[in-house]
């Protein structure tokens, strides 16, 4: 049964969950998972529900907040005030020492945001019972002013759902697994692989290094959280066939972990396979098409060979096409914004799904689980994209324009009035304060602090009318045309 919220900020209880909404009135009702009650399942899409199941994230309780409105005499701060925006404070029973817990907020416009237990927890925090409670402080998005293009208020009032999820964090053999949880999962499920594609798809045989070094080869390198079969799935079969023929069958996809190890480590593994499989003195000449973080792997192969063990072999990166690559980093990889990175990918994969979206979302959810345990270490692959981090600081210390480099980047703007896409774009624009594809800044694809990395005549800027996001580049006809122009 629904209970009334207290706009004065007092806690109310529903189904064992304490909820305070200072400045906001409305109703709250807990929905526990039970046979025959499908309300909890209806709060997220089938794709997200499947990904949660695959990641072993189980619903502890959903709390529906409905008929929300600004409280008449509420004490919560409002938009533009001296304090922060209004918040929901939820105190949820701990699932126990062997379990982790995280909260997924589902807004009325469908936007999904992850929230983690507050760091200043204590037993019985704010509660009336002796139970251990975990506290969540969830900022509420307030009405957004129009941006000059007729946009109205977004994501405020109406209905929100607090979806509380739990997961196992103890391993019978290894003990507490929260530390480096994502890296351990990635090592088991998303480790390295190399294969030569066929003319009809991205599947293929193991690499024959003798054949690969018989002429120029094309190397496809995927981006963050992804695999080659997902990242390049939008390339039409006839386009893959054309590339296969143009390179004499020497087209290779490079699967690699993107969360737990940095791009140089990825490049080092590739070179180790080359050195082990090719004869002494062999030369490998490659053109690279790299998406997202994969571009940093391509640059490691081209620019950081002093850190690679070529063992008497020679690697020549003849050209590289960067597609949505954070050469100057992305604010989403700043430790303060890792939550925003996970939110962005969760929404992108849900609202604009592609082949393998559930598999990609699984990787995202493993990082969500790790952050929920309070551990941010062991994410070197993500931290390599931090604009102020050590990895990019060293890589971009003396950037020089490279004639063989080319870049494609986009500034996303939704072409529909879909509320969720509008909300995603608004959030990204507030974070980046510059043109972006929701994940990386456009200009950072070809320049570092206004110093060019890619020649001006080898850049493609996709305008916002095409609504290209970070995950949809290869479905764009403009991108496919440009790849044909730049590649043999």
Question: What feature does the model see in each segment?
Answer:
Residues 1-253, 275-277, 468, 477-488:
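Flexible, membrane-associating and regulatory peripheral segments of lipid-active enzymes
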Residues 149-178, 303-488:
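Helical cap/lid subdomain of alpha/beta-hydrolase-fold lipid enzymes
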Residues 216-217, 285-287, 319:
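Structural motif
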Residues 230-234, 264-267, 300-303, 334-335:
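Short coil/turn segments at secondary-structure boundaries
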Residues 240-244, 277-281, 305-313:
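Alpha-helix termini
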Residues 250-258, 376-377, 465:
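Glycine- and acidic
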Residues 261-284:
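Helix-loop module immediately N-terminal to the HCX5R catalytic loop
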Residues 289-294, 298:
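Gly/Ala-rich beta-loop-alpha elbow adjacent to hydrolase catalytic centers
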């Amino acid at each position: 049964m629904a209970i009334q919220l207290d706009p004065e900020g007092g806690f109310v209880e529903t189904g064992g969950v304490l909820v305070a909404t200072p400045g906001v009135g409305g109703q709250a009702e807990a929905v526990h998972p039970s046979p025959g009650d499908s309300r909890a399942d209806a709060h997220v899409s089938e794709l997200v529900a499947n990904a949660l199941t695959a990641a072993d994230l189980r619903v502890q309780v959903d709390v529906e907040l409905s008929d929300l409105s600004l409280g008449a005499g509420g004490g919560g701060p409002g938009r533009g005030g001296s304090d922060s925006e209004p918040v929901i404070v939820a105190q949820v029973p701990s699932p126990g020492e062997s379990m982790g817990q995280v909260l997924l907020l589902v807004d009325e416009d469908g936007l999904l945001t992850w929230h983690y237990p507050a760091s200043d927890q204590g037993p019985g925090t704010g509660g009336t019972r002796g139970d251990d409670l975990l506290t969540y402080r969830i900022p509420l998005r307030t009405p957004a002013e129009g941006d000059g293009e007729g946009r109205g208020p977004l994501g405020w009032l109406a209905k929100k759902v607090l979806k509380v999820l739990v997961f196992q964090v103890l391993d019978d053999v290894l003990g507490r697994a929260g530390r480096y949880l994502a890296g351990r999962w990635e090592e088991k499920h998303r480790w390295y692989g190399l294969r030569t594609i066929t003319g009809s798809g991205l599947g293929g045989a193991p690499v024959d290094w003798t054949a690969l070094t018989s002429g120029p080869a094309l190397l496809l390198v995927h981006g963050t959280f992804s695999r080659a079969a997902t990242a390049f799935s939008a390339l039409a079969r006839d386009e893959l066939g054309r590339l296969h023929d143009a390179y004499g069958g020497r087209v290779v996809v490079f699967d690699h972990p993107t969360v737990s190890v940095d791009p140089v480590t990825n490049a080092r593994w590739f070179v180790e396979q080359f050195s082990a499989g090719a004869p002494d003195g062999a030369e490998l000449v490659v053109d690279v098409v790299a998406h997202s973080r994969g571009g940093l792997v391509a640059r490691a192969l081209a620019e950081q060979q002093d850190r690679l063990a070529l063992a008497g072999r020679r690697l020549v990166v003849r050209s590289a096409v960067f597609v949505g690559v954070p050469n100057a980093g992305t604010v989403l990889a700043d430790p303060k914004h890792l939550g925003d990175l996970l939110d962005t990918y969760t929404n992108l994969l849900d609202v604009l799904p592609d082949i393998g979206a559930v598999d990609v979302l699984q990787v995202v959810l493993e990082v969500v689980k790790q952050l929920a345990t309070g551990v941010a270490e062991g994410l070197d692959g993500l931290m390599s994209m931090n604009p102020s981090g050590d990895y990019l600081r060293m890589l971009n210390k003396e950037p020089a324009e490279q004639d063989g480099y080319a870049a494609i980047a986009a500034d996303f703007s939704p072409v529909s009035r879909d509320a969720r896409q509008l909300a995603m774009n608004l959030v990204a624009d507030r974070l980046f304060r510059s043109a972006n594809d929701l994940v990386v800044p456009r200009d950072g694809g070809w320049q570092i602090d206004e110093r060019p990395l890619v020649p001006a005549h080898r850049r493609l800027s996709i305008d916002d009318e095409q609504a290209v996001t970070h995950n949809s580049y290869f479905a764009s006809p403009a991108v496919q045309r440009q790849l044909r122009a730049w590649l043999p």
